[in-house]
């Protein structure tokens, strides 16, 4: 026996809300990196890419951390909601201010896109004539 299909609205919600999220956090101490990764994982998903860049003159003094991952937004959730929640989670875990920059990129097909190829397009492509 086959399993019943999920409601259509849920399928569309999942298919149409795929985003790449890139968060940059600066100035971090090296010991704070695991806390930021944990906050990112709790709010969004486990990062697929983690990049650390030392800033300032002395290595190990301060860092810029960039985390990148792709994931689905939940129903009725907006990218701004994720950015807000992630920023506050990082501040709460560190118990101090750090600059957080979040970039979201929509990865799905445009929900407003509609393509229709009729007689006019066929005639242009192949030089055909249609008579009614």
Residue ranges and their predicted role:
Residues 62-132:
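Charged interaction segments
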Residues 40-51, 87-95:
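A common structural junction motif
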Residues 1-42:
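Short, extreme N-terminal segment that most often corresponds to the first beta-strand
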Residues 1-3, 44-46, 79-81:
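A short linear-motif detector with a strong N-terminal bias
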Residues 3-13, 50-58, 104-105, 113:
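Short amphipathic beta-strand and strand-loop transition segments with alternating hydrophobic
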Residues 31, 43-54, 58-64:
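Structured domain cores in non-transmembrane regions
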Residues 14-27, 56-74:
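Short glycine-rich, basic-tinged beta-strand/loop micro-motifs
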Residues 33-44, 110-119:
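Surface-exposed flexible segments
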């Amino acid at each position: 026996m086959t399993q019943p299909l999920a409601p259509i609205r849920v399928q569309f919600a999942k298919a149409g809300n795929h985003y790449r999220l890139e968060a940059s956090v600066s100035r971090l101490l090296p010991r704070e990196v695991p806390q930021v990764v944990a906050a990112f994982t709790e709010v969004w998903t486990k990062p697929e890419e983690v990049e650390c860049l030392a800033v300032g003159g002395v290595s190990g003094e301060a860092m810029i951390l960039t985390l990148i991952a792709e994931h689905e937004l939940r129903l009725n959730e907006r990218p701004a909601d994720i950015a807000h929640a992630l920023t506050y989670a990082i501040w709460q875990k560190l118990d101090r201010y750090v600059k957080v920059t979040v970039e979201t990129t929509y990865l799905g097909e445009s929900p407003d896109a509609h393509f229709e190829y009729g007689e006019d397009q066929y005639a242009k492509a192949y030089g055909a004539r249609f008579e009614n």
